[in-house]
Design a protein with these regions (language model features):
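Bacterial N-terminal signal peptides
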Residues: 8-17
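Short, surface-exposed coil-to-beta transition loops
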Residues: 111-113, 146-151, 324-326, 358-364
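Bacterial N-terminal signal peptides that target proteins for export
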Residues: 1-7
Length: 453
């Protein structure tokens, strides 16, 4: 039984004779709902595919990695050039891994696949996605390094199975752990030795310098704030309480809203990384609020745009690193599909020219609203957990959060007074426990410095 016939049968059984108006679901409704569900499944399949790439790469399972690619696929990592076809991809990756499958004793080769922004084409056979790749690399007793970069990938569905068609990793930096990213120097030839000994099939598609040089990876998507019209494919005005078909449509719409909010916040992070403040500001609703740590609350899109200058001037600059990774979302969309809330984690990698760089980590508690058919941020509140000089790390070098600017004062004071590490403030949970259904009644300790609870 085909998916369409099965869906029609299920809907007919669900609707039944008790709902004569829609007892025979129209072909148009069935087609729309089928496309909606299929696209949602495709997005999840693409995410699973890329995450499998990361897990296999972690353990140097090169045959398994290569099998994720289409026969005519390409891979391009950094400045090494383009390798074409699964056999060439396998040999290239194996050589990068030291000529063997599996890790050597004491080897660390973690490649986290984070912050996806996934779009499936209308044909349902092709997709594009942007991912952040964070590497923790090294050999026990010998070396340790960090790496970070951005994938802009393409995918293809063949015989019902999603595969990687093009993997292109733009490497931001590879840095020895002790030195850190802030003290890296430009290099004339960023190619690996493998690429020199095992030349690619094609030269690099783009040439760029790794950090501290400026790098802006092309976006495969437009700013979602520029979208117009309601995106709900299978939605309608039917009464879900009295119409089972409408209930299916509503469930599909809420799933789509969840994906669009995840894309929105991921896009926010990618724009924020490069100080693209004009694009960041567009992601906010007209009367939104923005609160970062103890800087206070900025109200309205125009004032938020000005406040973003507190993080540096518009656009990327040489020697500046402003990575704000958007991770670990817990998203809840309201039943009406018009508002949503989400909790996120952010890990920060920061640097300014001629500094040691900084580490940071924190939690977002955000709210969203659908405005003009597009999801936008209505409230962004970032709670800083820790901020530290890279050379000192958390145990020795935590530094205080910035406070309200005298040059560009906020519209309101901070909604909560707290200290980052060594303080242990707990941002309140806006959602119930997913198993017990009970609210999380956990409280932060009193701030002994400021006397506020």
């Amino acid at each position: 039984m085909t998916g369409r016939i099965l869906l029609a049968a299920l809907l007919a059984a669900a609707v039944g004779a008790a709902h004569p108006v829609r007892a025979a679901a129209t072909p148009a409704h069935i087609d729309a709902l089928e496309r909606e569900v299929q696209e949602l499944e495709d997005v999840r399949a693409v995410k699973t595919l890329q995450r499998a790439y990361g897990y296999y790469t972690d353990r140097a399972l090169w045959s398994e990695v290569a099998d994720l690619f289409a026969d005519d696929a390409t891979i391009e990592l950094g400045a090494d050039g383009v390798y074409v076809g699964r056999p060439r991809i396998l040999e290239y990756l194996r050589r990068l891994g030291g000529g063997r499958d599996g890790l050597a004793y004491g080897e660390l080769h973690e490649h986290l696949q984070l912050q996806p922004v996934v779009h499936v084409d209308k044909d349902g056979q092709h997709a594009k996605a942007r991912w952040r790749d964070v590497g923790m690399l090294g050999q026990y007793g010998k070396s340790a390094a960090w790496s970070e970069g951005v994938f802009e990938n393409e995918y293809v569905k063949r015989n019902g199975v999603w595969m990687i068609l093009s993997a292109h990793l733009y490497i931001t930096f590879v840095a020895p752990y002790e030195l850190g990213w802030a003290r890296l120097k430009p290099t004339d030839d960023p190619r690996t030795q493998v690429a020199k000994d095992f030349p690619p099939d094609r030269p690099p598609t783009v040439r760029y310098g790794q950090f501290p040089q400026v790098q802006l990876v092309p976006f495969h998507y437009h700013n979602p704030a520029d979208a117009r019209g309601d995106k709900a494919k299978a939605g309608g005005d039917s009464d879900a309480a009295n119409d089972p078909l409408a209930a299916y449509e509503r469930r599909a719409r809420l799933l789509r809203d969840h994906d669009e909010i995840e894309n929105l916040q991921g896009i926010y992070g990618y724009y924020f990384d490069k100080n693209l403040w004009d694009e960041v500001a567009k992601l906010f609703a007209r009367h939104a609020t923005f609160e970062d740590g103890q800087r206070g609350v900025y109200v309205g899109r125009e004032h938020i745009r000005k406040a973003l200058q507190l993080f540096g001037p518009q656009g990327p600059r040489q020697g500046q690193l402003n990575n704000y990774m958007q991770l670990q979302p817990v998203i809840h969309v309201a039943d009406d599909g018009k508002t949503a809330k989400a909790r996120w984690r952010s890990v920060m990698q920061l640097a300014q020219p001629n500094t040691d760089g900084q580490w940071g980590e924190g939690t977002y508690e955000n709210e969203y609203v659908k405005e003009g058919g597009a999801w936008k941020i209505s409230k962004l509140h970032f709670y800083v957990t820790a901020l530290a000089d890279y050379s000192q790390m958390w145990n020795k070098g935590p530094i205080p959060m910035p406070v309200a600017s005298a040059v560009l004062p906020p519209d309101r004071p901070p909604t909560e007074i707290y200290r980052s590490l060594p303080g242990v403030y707990l941002p309140p949970f806006r959602y119930a426990h997913p198993v017990t259904g009970q609210p999380i009644d956990a409280h932060a300790p009193a701030d002994t410095v400021l006397g506020r609870k």
